[in-house]
């Protein structure tokens, strides 16, 4: 990996992705061998939006590498509540930390932050834009279950506002993957992303129902409807609950189908699916630690 920051999956080549995933696999096989690798290193956690998995797995990843974390805490308890700008906030934190993990409600925030600091910035979600570290653990999970070439992936739910979808679709274009996008018409993949996928030569099809395409899929990637991104609550209510994966629907799927979800789920996947062989979303969340350890090693190690 040759970049100073990770802002978008569009900056990653297949080689970049495979290098990080290979390193994550090595870490998972020998997690104890990394404990003193980054003694004295500090990772700044700057979350302007709620987070459970991303925040905690980055915290665990840095500590398992032998480093420490400092957490900005909630926006209400920081100087942002007094009107401090993002640029000023990251400039200050860059004086305390060796890298910054940033989540922000505004698309493009991570790219902006990277312009003001000379330490690595990792985009942990920028509004409806990108979530590249989620994609890396998604790809790791896919590779462990079905591989990353000659597979068919269905991505269902909120494709318009879902940043995990935007990142994943771009990254999958580096591999031999047939991508099927399943959503209500009002939540289709943004036009610019569709154009980019076609320009990359990706095999892409769009659908409005899951059942018709389910038998063809190796992976079904389900996402929640991003209620917090909707400008109109009525629009959200019209599309909420349209896609729900349960054991009845999965009876139409191949026995080897892998069901994934970036979490948190609301009601997109019934709890009864959790105990089936299809469910991989908790494995997916678990993979966040070794993958983010590998990413921190790639970025901070290079910066040092």
UniProtKB/Swiss-Prot annotation:
Which top EC class is given?
transferase
Q: Which family does it belong to?
A: Belongs to the aspartate/ornithine carbamoyltransferase superfamily. ATCase family.
Q: What is its EC number?
A: 2.1.3.2
Q: Which reaction does it catalyse?
A: carbamoyl phosphate + L-aspartate = N-carbamoyl-L-aspartate + phosphate + H(+)
One GO MF term, please? aspartate carbamoyltransferase activity
Report the superkingdom from the record: Archaea
According to the record's subunit comment, the protein's assembly and interactions are: Heterooligomer of catalytic and regulatory chains.
Q: What is this protein called?
A: Aspartate carbamoyltransferase catalytic subunit
Task: List, alphabetically, the SUPFAM superfamilies matched.
Answer: Aspartate/ornithine carbamoyltransferase (SSF53671)
Q: Does the keyword Transferase apply?
A: yes
Binding-site residues, carbamoyl phosphate: 53-54, 103, 131, 134, 263-264
> What NCBIfam families does UniProt report for this protein, alphabetically?
asp_carb_tr, PRK00856.1
Q: Which key words are in the record?
A: Pyrimidine biosynthesis, Transferase
GO terms in the biological process aspect are: 'de novo' pyrimidine nucleobase biosynthetic process; 'de novo' UMP biosynthetic process; amino acid metabolic process
Species assigned in the record: Haloquadratum walsbyi (strain DSM 16790 / HBSQ001)
Pathway connected to this protein:
Pyrimidine metabolism; UMP biosynthesis via de novo pathway; (S)-dihydroorotate from bicarbonate: step 2/3
PROSITE patterns reported for this sequence? CARBAMOYLTRANSFERASE
> Function, please?
Catalyzes the condensation of carbamoyl phosphate and aspartate to form carbamoyl aspartate and inorganic phosphate, the committed step in the de novo pyrimidine nucleotide biosynthesis pathway.
Entry binding sites for L-aspartate: 82, 163, 224
